[in-house]
């Protein structure tokens, strides 16, 4: 599939499949975005439902700052809360509860299809996932347009 420039910003959108997913390049998410870039990213998200930004160096502060350019972030998780300093962030790391319990974390194999945080009365309209550690192979996150 062919990458395309969108509107007036310098971003490039490259579809990753026929129906869902696109990679966006030509933007540095660690700095404030101009209104044209925000509009183009939003348009790509509406069209492709899932967008990917590779090679971005974001810490928690930059992650939340970037998210605020697209709306008001919600608490990281309605039941389990979020990060102490950044309540908008909820870790989905495998061992995230290791320090909050006296017993070792339970490692369970995949237990079925699920969608994150959608049981909330007012679920977020989108989620922003950021990977701190990217395995060399074996990632199996899947996306669906419900």
Segments and roles (model prediction):
Residues 2-146:
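Non-heme Fe(II) oxygenase catalytic core, chiefly the N-lobe of the double-stranded beta-helix
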